[in-house]
Amino acid sequence: MYGLWKPRVLGAWKVPATGPVIFAVNHSHNIDGPMVMGVAPRPTHFLIKQEAFIGPLDPFLTGIGQLKVDRTTADRTAIGRALGVLEQGGVLGIFPEGTRGDGDFASLRAGLAYFAVRGGAPIVPVAVLGSADRPGRLVKALPPLRSRVDVVFGDPFEAGDGSGRRTRKALDEATERIQKRLTAHLENARRLTGRWATLE
């Protein structure tokens, strides 16, 4: 990543050095996941749509510990592998919006809350800013080479309410709490990086 773009990493020291952790990452460009994997202080295993595992990318992504998920169904194999990452004290990366969008955490799925509550892992919000600002000159599908991309790690927090409940209502409530925390982190990240202007 450092050879292609100019990542500026803020708050990496906030990531717990050991134990299970979930990175909740906003998602507006295809390079967001690789960017976080490249700059994170700990190895990260992302849940990635199965459509990305094509050709030579399949053995490559699998070899570096990324997790294939079928988004059209409750993929029990992917769920089990993701929980396994947390059980082994690893870092699980999730795009809580479920797919690429505006990257503003406006619509979250319940999966993040499920993994956080079931896996007993704190959530670290991660904002990737600048990846979708403008297309590159040589490759339109990528940000301009050597352009700055900011990756801002936030304070870890617990998704549950302390009751240990895993009911649908409890997960819905946890999702609401998570969304507020992620949105607040994104706003703070924009202030820290001076990227408010990109919204105007």
Report residues per predicted region:
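Catalytic core of membrane glycerolipid acyltransferases/transacylases, capturing the structured
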Residues: Y2-G3, L10, V15-A74, R81
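N-terminal membrane-anchoring alpha-helices
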Residues: M1-K6, A197-L199
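Proline-rich intrinsically disordered, low-complexity coils
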Residues: P7, P16, P20, P34, ...
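Short, conserved catalytic or adaptor-binding loops enriched in Gly and charged residues
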Residues: M1-Y2, F60-L61, P143-P144, D150
